[in-house]
Amino acid sequence: MSSLGQIVSAVEDYRKLVAAKVRTARSDQRVGQELLARWREVKERIGTTVTPTGLRLPRLALPEMDDPGEIARFLLEEGLPGEFPFLTSAYAEQYLEPAAPPPNDEATNQSDPISEEPTRLFAGLGLAEDTNERFHYLSRNQRNKRLSTAFDGPTLYGTGSAADGVLGKIGEGGVSIDTIEDMERLYAGFDLDQPNVSVSMTISGPAPILLAMYIGAAKRRFGPDVMPKLRGTIQADVLKEIQAQNELIFPIDASLRFLADMVDFCSKKMPRWYPISISGYHIAEAGATPVQQGAYTLSNGFSYVEYFRSRGMDVNVFGPRLSFFLDCGLDIEYLALARVCRKIWAIGMRDVFGADRRAQLFKLHTQTSGRSLIAADWRNNLTRTAVEIVLACMNATNSCHSNSADEPFTTPSEEYARYAAHAQSIVLEESGLFKHMMNTLSGSPGMKIVGNAVEDAILEEFRNIDEQGGVVGAVERRYQRSQIQASSHILERQIYGGIRPLIGLNRYADPDESWPEVPMIRTPREKKQRQRERLDDFERRHAGESERCLDRLSEVVESDENVFEELVKTIEHCSLGQITERLCDVVGKFRPMV
């Protein structure tokens, strides 16, 4: 039995434990009285908030119960916010505003956003200075600067901008990064050493090289002791690359080794950095159902835990630095998907891997569904994204990226990127859905029914993967890819057969609709040429040191030393393309699955 089989057993055992505790609470008078006393104490500790209209509400919504068995069931199945099994949320007061004075107090007229707003907006276009300008635009009114970075195709594949055949791809769909100097330009003007600034990088294949460049750029600006202060996330999810994207560069064994070295380094030296974001988003966008997204994301996560432990790494050291990334679409499963993932992760980490509380937390970034956005009657995408934001917040996501309505046509324009950001602000700051009270819908019959069905389906998918020999065995048999492809095919048939409504496309379509005049955002040829010239200049200036650094990197890869620790030195004199080429010479190249 692989760890997935053990996790299925652990979740089933937890269900049995809950049932046993419920029976005991009802049959043992002493236990029942203790639970009733605890319930009263919990409710007495809850503070109150006052809405702008003067309504006084508890800051935490709890059901009215006087049956010890139901109290036991609620505490063990739902849990209080921030308490095992974290079904409600990972933290106690996630979106709540500070406790407010009465509405006639002058302080209520002061506009102050929630203390840790979850808004993250994805940006990446052209050269480093172009994306830097977009970052400053998107964050100009934000107290917390959350810089989420998209990279262009050559960067994602670790290819230098001077390589043959890539000129037309430079800066398209993301930012072009070749050297540590590009990285300095990318985040210029942001205080990377401050707690209100964090950086996210959506890149997996060459992730260790890019993170090394980021560390190097931060050291140049803020000094050699800056690493413990850096906040952010890098994706680095090599398993989902095989299952859904094919942007892997190195063979799977080497990729896992490089990843483990980076996670080990960051866990010990960068306590505010997440060196991996275990990602279901791309799995969902490739065509997976919500259940498949949850099952493959969780199973990949547990596989990483197994692998890191096999390398002698301590789960209580690296566990708190694992993060997750899920898609949120419009299917009803999204009412509870992230909640269920949080619960399964906590049980698996605690009961199978012996992790402590910090390592049990499923820390989640959510992005609204890109696949749900369509070109037909495209302004409806504003509504689709708004609904998805509400669903994401109902699942207590820790951060959120909302897509721009014009994405079916082009890289997000400034106008619609602003609307996407404001949609989150309207949901969390303007509306009262989440800022006054935690747990508004947790425990509701509908949410419980959906959650239980999703949990059962995820465990069944775990059993299927376990029968394939675990995640790696299933990957080798193309199991996940084939399931994703089949689900994608079914979805398309449902859409074009009219079974699945898409407003403006197969229902209530406007026959007179004309396509909008949306300017295509492209990187001018002169900028692409400038990027090549910068790369040539960097490699020429460092020609004396680069070969020596690459030779030393090769030695480290062939030994048992930490590769990432050496990369932090290598990037000072070598470009992304040079490093990738040398690593491929040593470990080989990944052969994409077709």
Segments (PLM) and residue ranges:
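Flexible, glycine-rich loop/tail regions that form catalytic "lids" or insertion modules at the edges
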Residues: 1-136, 144-153, 425, 429-594
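Residue-level marker of motif borders
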Residues: 167, 174-176, 390, 438, ...
